Amino acid sequence: MTDVASRDGETWQQTLVYWGYRATQWLAGALPDAVGRRLFEVGGRLAFAVASDRRRNALANLARILGRDPGDAVVRATAIEAFELYARYWFDSFRLPAVSITSIDARIEAIGFDNLDRALAAGRGCVVAIGHLGNPDVVAAWAAWKGYPIASVAERLRPERLFQLFRRQREGYGVRLFPTGEPGLKERLAEHVRDNGVVALAADRDLSGRG
């Protein structure tokens, strides 16, 4: 789907979001690694300063986890670090097409993949519960490069061309991506498993709206 075809029905806010992500993608690929990481961390700090609702939610959640008041200095410092790390996540994800997969392989220590190997060797396929820990995009790209037939489900973002942007990138490194709400989604995932594939599902986020 082209950018022109995808603009139908977009609000101006959605258009700004789309081009913001496109600019971020370009920047991540163009900058040297060390410079990009530092710049995105600064961007994370800026987001903490201006995104009042997200900042308030982060402070409230971390205060509960740490057993401190939301205004506590430790809670605030931890929240700022979380925003920096989230910005780093986007840098690493968008930089993937510009990074050698062998350099990623050299930095990954794979633990527990023998369980996948046994399941696939037996022709059973499997479903893997994953969490938003580290960078799932990097791990998925690495696993696909290693030959694991990975499929996953992603939230159908708006505007549509933003979803397609992420879909093209992930499918570009070998991960099949199914959008939420797609007719026959469960059947397609089950078919992927029956074909001796691996379905990776984020188990720490509920997209149903029911908590």
Name each model feature, range by range.
Residues 2-130, 163-168, 172-175:
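Membrane-anchoring hydrophobic helices of lipid-metabolizing enzymes
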Residues 97-211:
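Soluble catalytic domains of membrane acyltransferases
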